[in-house]
Amino acid sequence: MIPGEIITLPEDQEIILNAGRPTLDIMVSNKGDRPIQVGSHYHFLEVNEDLEFYEIDSESKNFIFIDRSNLHNKTRGMRLNIPAGTAVRFEPGDIKKVQLVPLAGTREIYGFNGKINGQLDSSVEQ
């Protein structure tokens, strides 16, 4: 190996991110008047409050509002399922479908908007 060398798969092979991990598809709407950008590993429950989340009903295809004041909603412990170091930008009025994947590792959340600040699976919200 040469220092700084990047070794990739052959061109005919795809790199599959988060293979075999559970995912959640939701719709996200920017109700604010400014663009909002969310990074790859940002705890999605704690993103800017101007973003509204909706589940997609599998039968009717209708949107079902996800209450963000409930800290145990489906986005808890989830992040965007995109390559590390990248982000998704939501322009004012945008409605986008995004895929979320559970945070891995120790599943401890500190900082962000201060809603968890501890172990995800047993934290006391502040």
UniProtKB/Swiss-Prot annotation:
GO biological process: urea catabolic process
Enzyme Commission number(s) of this protein: 3.5.1.5
Keywords from the UniProt entry: Cytoplasm, Hydrolase
Reaction catalyzed: urea + 2 H2O + H(+) = hydrogencarbonate + 2 NH4(+)
Keyword check for Zinc: no
Location within or outside the cell: Cytoplasm
Pathway the protein acts in: Nitrogen metabolism; urea degradation; CO(2) and NH(3) from urea (urease route): step 1/1
GO molecular-function term, one example from the UniProt record: urease activity
Entry similarity comment: Belongs to the urease beta subunit family.
Protein name: Urease subunit beta
UniProt organism field: Gloeothece citriformis (strain PCC 7424) (Cyanothece sp. (strain PCC 7424))
Organism classification: Bacteria, Bacillati, Cyanobacteriota, Cyanophyceae, Oscillatoriophycideae
